[in-house]
Amino acid sequence: MTTRLDRLVVLLDSGSTSVVRETAAKQIGDIQKVHPDELYNLLGRVVPYLKSKNWDTRVAAAKAIGGIVENVPVWNPNRTSPVKKEETEDLPSFNGDTEEKPFIKTEEGAPASSQSQVVVSSNLTSNSEVSKLEEERLSTRSHSQEIKPIVDFGPDEETAKELNTELKGKFENSLLSFESFDIANVLKAGKKLLGSASRDYDVNPANYSTHYLQQLSNLKSRLDLAGEYLDDSIMNDLGDNVGSNSKGSPTTSIPEHKTSINNNKPEDTPTPSENVHLSARQRNALKRKARQMKNSQKVRVIDVAPTLVHQQNSTSSADKKTGADYNFTAQSRSDRLVVEHKAPIVPSAAVAVTSDSVWPFETLVELLLIDMFDPSWEIRHGACMGLREIIRYAGFGYGRVVGKSEAENEQLNKKYFDDLLCRIACVFALDRFGDYLADQVVAPIRESVSQVLGVALIYVPNDSVFSMYKVLHSLVFQNELGLTNTVWEAAHGGMLGIKYLVAVKYPLFFSHSDYLDSLINTVIHGLANHDDDVRAVSALTLLPIADKLVQEKLSSCKNLLKVLWDCLDDVKDDLSSSTSCVMDLLSSLCSFTEVMNLMQETANSDPEFSFETLVPRLFHLMRYTLTGVRRSVVYALTKFISVQTSCSWITGLTLRLCFQNVLLEQQEDISKSSCELAQRVMDILYRDGPESFSKLLYSHIEPMLKVSITPIGSFRRPYPLDTTLIVKPSGQPYAPSTSRERNNNISELSNSRTKHRAKDDPKGSFCFSVDEPMLNGDVEFVGEERMLKARLRASSLLGRIIGRWKRDEILLFFKPFLQACLTSSFSTPVVLGSRLIESFFEVEDNDLTIQKDELYHLLCDQFATVPRENYANLVSQLHVVRAQCNALLNTFLDVGRLSRSKIPSLAVVVKGDPEAGPIAFGIADAEKLVGPTYENLCKLLSPSQKAQSSKALNEIKYLIIDEISIYKIAKERQDIQCSASIASAMVTYDKLPKKLNSIIKGIMESIKKEQFSCLQMHSASAMMKLISACYKESRQVISEKIVRNLCAYVCMDTTETPIFHDSGKNGILSLHSIGTSDDNDEQVSGKLVDDSDDVSNDRKSSLSSVSDKDAAVLQRMGAQLTLQQMAQNFGSSLFSRVPVLSQCLFVPLQQYAESGFPSEVDQASCTVGQDLLDAMSILRFLVAYLDSGLQSEIVSTLPHLLATLQSNYSAVRNMASKCFAAITESNAAGSKALHLLVEDVVPLLGDASSTIHRQGAIECIYHVVQRLGVRILPYILYLIIPLLGRMSDADQDVRVLATTSFATLVKLVPLEAGLPDPPDLPQYLLDSREKERKFLEQMLNPSKVEAFSIPVPISADLRKYQQEGVNWLAFLNKYELHGILCDDMGLGKTLQTICIVASDHYNRQKLFEESGSPKFAHVPSLIVCPSTLAGHWQQELSTYAPFLKVSAYVGPPAERAKIRSKMKKSDVVVTSYDICRNDVDELVKIDWNYCVLDEGHVIKNARAKLTKAVKSLRSYHRLILSGTPIQNNVLELWSLFDFLMPGFLGTEKTFQERFVRPIAASRDAKSSSKERERGTLALEAIHKQVLPFMLRRLKEDVLADLPPKIIQDYYCDMSDLQRKLLNDFVSQLNINEELEDDETEKTQGTRKKKSQKAHIFQALQYMRKLCNHPALILTEKHPKRNAIVKQLAKENSGLHDLKHAPKLTALGQLLRDCGLGNSSVNSNGIDSALTNAVSEHRVLIFCQLKDMLDMVEKDLLQATMPDVTYMRLDGSVEPTKRQEAVTKFNNDPSIDVLLLTTHVGGLGLNLTGADTVIFVEHDWNPMRDLQAMDRAHRIGQKKVVNVYRLITRGCLEEKIMGLQRFKMNVASTVVNQQNAGLSSIGTDQILDLFNTTADEQQTVQNIDKEESEDAAGRGLSGTSKKALEGLPEMWDESQYDEFNLDGFISTLPKDAS
């Protein structure tokens, strides 16, 4: 059974997001708070995930451990039992036991005895009693989840205790201490810790203790501590223990924890103690097997308990007397009780418990300390994080023991922590693993172990802190250790340790000035280190204490500041990552006034230390290669400005450099920060007024203006920036690098780590390659929008500069420039100039009115000139068009052979060229050429010329047409950008012209068609300003028209807003666009065609092509942005300021809710339906931006939306669902909408009377779930149960969305319990949620499900397993689920079915009487079975439930017609499959309660007419009975579940892809390992998915009193005649094949294939008959029959002689062995047949063929055994009389033999009168044979059943047996013992299995992807391919956020003790 804990633990690894993982980790910790006794159970489950290969999994596991440990009370042995110092001498040193046995409490508080189960109380629970819940958990825990001991001491407790104490003492003596620790020796001789491990480190999980001690021993060599720091005798003893298997040697057992459902366990491998007498070969074999077991298990539960106690296996005498060997099952009648034997209970393993004497985490910490030195970096990383969490919360108890005084425990605590600190130092010294992907190296292990150090320092005394500091200091100053070659990784680790040490213990340094001075010197030394990463960490070390340093040690800052400035001045490496860290420290220090004063004092004596000298050193880093450095420079300069009152270092050059930063920067955040920095610089420069400002910038403004308006070209023709207009920090113009220099820079970039770099060019001339793409105008590399965005920001900055310029010079200097921009032949200067003017307008200064008016008129003048005829930046495209036109004319000349005089000439110059005149080539010329000119020239061609040249001419013509289209689209884009930019600038001035049409059109065109989001958003903002201005000036008519058009544009995108008249009424529209999200707008391709101004009503025609649809998306996005900006800016006054918007949104909804649709709504002229869709669509996009003050308007709309959800139109339901989901996500009315969802929408799911209502409700829930994600958690309980019922809905669309929604919610169920209640949830909903939670718990935990009490008297006594079967059927009934009861043959499936059907009919009748609801009205149930069993069902129903009205719908058509009128009044109708197929039209008219398919595997063929007929039946509950649900392949299972729950296993195609194909491929002998793996995984997956819906019990498991069934194969050798016939047939077959090969070469492939199939089938049939009897094939048609008969006659023999049929001979012998046919005369002369009227054995003889039965009857029984009495049951017996024959055979013991065909007698019949079954023939389908043999082996059988299978050796039958074995394997894998009952079936699995259903499409895609990858990898060699497969994925840099020092410090506990 999978518990909530299991699912939470799995989420640590499988959680889709970090939020889900963290929530799961938190809730695991909360479990520890509620159940403190679960400590080791929780830790044992979580700890294995620390070794995961996945980073996020390890982090989540560490957080879970932290949550667990945090909720464990602080372990303080002296708090509860203080011990005086003088008393400690007599106490043991390890566990402190004062008695011989651990302190044990029984349940009643009495002393524990061997007769009772014990539960041990730990010190964690103080004096509280262990709860009964814990006792139940320990006693009922399943075998796979038992917690096993970490150390098993064997039977001798005293020896165990001594060894435990001895080991503890040795461990204590082996602890490292600072007094003897030599870090230099570790550095010199220690083994390096690299990134990965080899196979040599594989650990056998069954022998973990050996690995544990071996790893402990390995530390001696790894750390090179031989003889110096560990006692040799101790290590030798440990080594001896590792290698020996002595009695006292501790062993470790790690139980297997499987996340899959399968409980089948591999055979136990012998423990080391059992291996003593094994040979070397046997031991190696066991090792290999153990390694395979290790590789096969994903997660193992590790027991981390320090001690254990064994559970006693013996039971009390009371238990023995009360019938421990029996099951008691109460019956529906209170006076009945069934008593059954039960199998003996296997005693559970030892239960681990805690000891009062040991810190609870001791064992786990020891394991993690060993893992900290594991060769694999992932394991080291996980171990460090685990240690960090344990020490963080529980470090106080580390090393302490009970029985020691407080002082002694303090010493032990110090001793253990000193050992930990020494080990941490060793990791710093030896770790070499680092990630070089980011700007600076990140060393996960060194960072993580630094955090362990940080938490450990909380608990250690000061002397240990200083000792650790000295060790870390030595790692930094390695030259002091005498090392010739320093190790930068060790120095890096040392500095990391110091960084965390300082962060945690900084007060200690400030109280010891000598250590503080040493710290500063260490940092300065680190800053001078040649390694860049050491410098970076050194700078970060002082960053957290910069304020304290300034306050306490200001004098020491002087040297530090000098070093920091020197570091910045000395940057020569273009990849120096430490620069940003140095910059951060410097800016932090300089943010203090004291430091600035200190620098000023220093500057007075040393001018080189002034800011005017120092700050310019930063300027050359503004365009540094590394992003982090550029970001830090901007941040530092901003900090400097904010703290300085006088910034003398700020000049005009400073502003220009900031401007250039904006112009060239590609990173969005740095660009924005640069704008802010430039604004601050501008403000400082403007302090002395406009005149001073202008003077400072006079020499800079012109180049800034010129460079900012550089046109943006295309990838065909870029326009580079004029580098002479860009200056370096020195003030010199930027000199572009030569090609040689660029190549050098590129080669340097390729070296990610360069420790020693030669001197570069002098400062100021160094050329960084980061800006080359921007400088070169490389649009293809940078992207046109990114480049434009930078230019626009620069232009806005220039506008603000002009706004501060000297007033009388603004127009004089800047108007000509701006006029040139607006009249430029390029489009870019127009856009940028307009933006500059707009920015100028935004400067608030009344003195600028005249200048603004002048520039406004300039805009008005230029606005009239747009659009222009052409743009210079499109000249290159026009040249391309001209070249293509010229090629077309040349084709007419060369290919068409026209004379040159007839061909027109083209102008050489194109429009836009500098020398172009009025007759220059333009796009109109090109259009004319491919139009009338082309037609005229074609007419001049002769027919032969046309034939020769038409193809070439058409190709070039269409090329020209394409180029024209490209040019026109580009031209239109430039027109829109220019007109929108000018119009937006005009609107900003707040002075609207009288005529607004052109302005509105310019901005609206940009909103509709602009592809660049920055321009579209700007136009949206301008339109918002325009609307606001119109309302201010009382021009509402204009603004209302604009708003209505915007609303119409929002709805133009038919992918988001459907067309009302195109949508039908049935179905769910979301299923047609389930992959469409609301956030896919970025994928718009941008091919624009539509340029109409008006909103077209005919959307379908205007949006027909792909490009038109993309244009509609752009329209929708632009209009959406505008409305959203309006909502954000207008706030709560939105609807009062823009009342027309309120009308568009709410009026259509209100009208529909009040009166519905008018009758003419379906007419094309009626727009009511479309208006409603549009209103909901707009509200959907707008609601998230509405102010919370508008909540009342939105809440009042919710009831209207509820009405639309129940609309008859699918489009209305679709939009209502999306709109409702959007409201649930909004702040305005989200909680109210969710309340409505629970109260009103969810009940619609259960409306059986209306499919429309269910479709609307499920569509709404689907969209809410998809939108809210994790935020749906508080409401998940209201949804999960209703969705579960709808997953088997009669409507396919409802099923699909219910399953999809369920699959999304099911992953969140484990997280629900730990969440607080929403603050605004009404009390009645809270109460309802508690009921739902209780309901869900019953479903998830089968132990909490109440046993189903059968409310009707059943005339039979149910066995225990039958009652459990009825419970399972009741469970399905309760949750509206359906299933397969596939118990073994003979276990009473019929009886269990009758019980649930009768009970449900009774319950429905009772509910109908109480409520009168039509939902519970009487409806009959239908039993469909094979015709043979129809009578059997009638008999069983009349026997067990005589109160049910049963109608048998069987017989000829006339009789059936009479019964039809009675069927609806009957309780149960029994019919056959044949009748169901023929009369399906009558049966589908009735709604059935239960539809039961007996032997339901007959519908295995999904395409059969019978199957389709059965699946068309309608019923509330569906049940299949089948002892063999899978007979040949798993595809049959799909057909069965397609009847039960259509869609549950996906479509047949996806099922084939996911399951059938991989399983079939894995059978192939040539299959690869990956294919075999896929096959295995597919079998496991299908098993997991169908598990909860299939109940399977085997007779041997549930019937202890059922005698055994013995199956024996009886081999027969072929007779001479058979062998001769076989050889002749094979020879003839080979000859025929040769002849056919020659003939079929002339025939078609399909005919050949069909003939071959028929040929093979005939051959198989021939050989099958030959195995049975030669007479079966030697018919009258056989060509050799006469010759063989004559030959036999000569030998006095015949075809029917038994010697020719060895099977009949063997059958006769078997019958005689059974005592049949042995007629003889005894001594009294009396025939023995008369003496023994009844034989001891009775026999069933099965054959496949009726002809074979005839031969058995005539040739054997009648001819040679006349005294054997027999009956016969085959197809010749009428179905209605077959049950009568069965009854007669069972009741008359004088009948010796029953002859049957497998087809007729092998299904459903009870033939327990026989005890011997003989198969003369065998079925290809093994399940048919199994069913046949179980006719005798079933309930009621008192004798051992012997089954004999007659097999002809060396022939086809042996192959049939082999095929049967494979099919049995597949069937047993899918349906196995996990389907045994509610407890093992795991009803909770319902919440897991639908993940597969929801993701099936993705799975198919993954399979295809894997196959394509396999195909791609086939070209690689074996080694290369393995290496490629072994490469892990790159991890995300955001994972390193956990190494943030500030975040770490914030998590440290406030109180360490």
Swiss-Prot record:
Enzyme class, broadest EC rank: hydrolase
GO molecular-function term, one example from the UniProt record: RNA polymerase II general transcription initiation factor activity
Keywords of this entry: ATP-binding, DNA-binding, Helicase, Hydrolase, Nucleotide-binding, Nucleus, Phosphoprotein, Repeat, Transcription, Transcription regulation
Record-listed Phosphoserine modification sites: S144
Domain of life the protein comes from: Eukaryota
GO CC term (a single one): nucleus
Compartment(s): Nucleus
Segments of skewed composition (Polar residues): 242-276
BP GO annotations: transcription initiation at RNA polymerase II promoter
Chain intervals for the UniProt region annotation (Disordered): 79-141, 240-278, 730-762, 1078-1103, 1901-1920
Amino-acid positions noted as binding ATP in the UniProt annotation, renumbered to this chain: D1383, D1384, M1385, G1386, L1387, G1388, K1389, T1390
InterPro entries: ARM-like (IPR011989), ARM-type_fold (IPR016024), Helicase_ATP-bd (IPR014001), Helicase_C-like (IPR001650), Mot1 (IPR044972), Mot1_ATP-bd (IPR044078), Mot1_central_dom (IPR022707), P-loop_NTPase (IPR027417)
Boundaries of every Helicase C-terminal domain copy: 1725-1877
Major localization class: nucleus
Family according to the record: Belongs to the SNF2/RAD54 helicase family.
The name this protein goes by in its record: TATA-binding protein-associated factor mot1
Native source organism of the sequence: Schizosaccharomyces pombe (strain 972 / ATCC 24843)
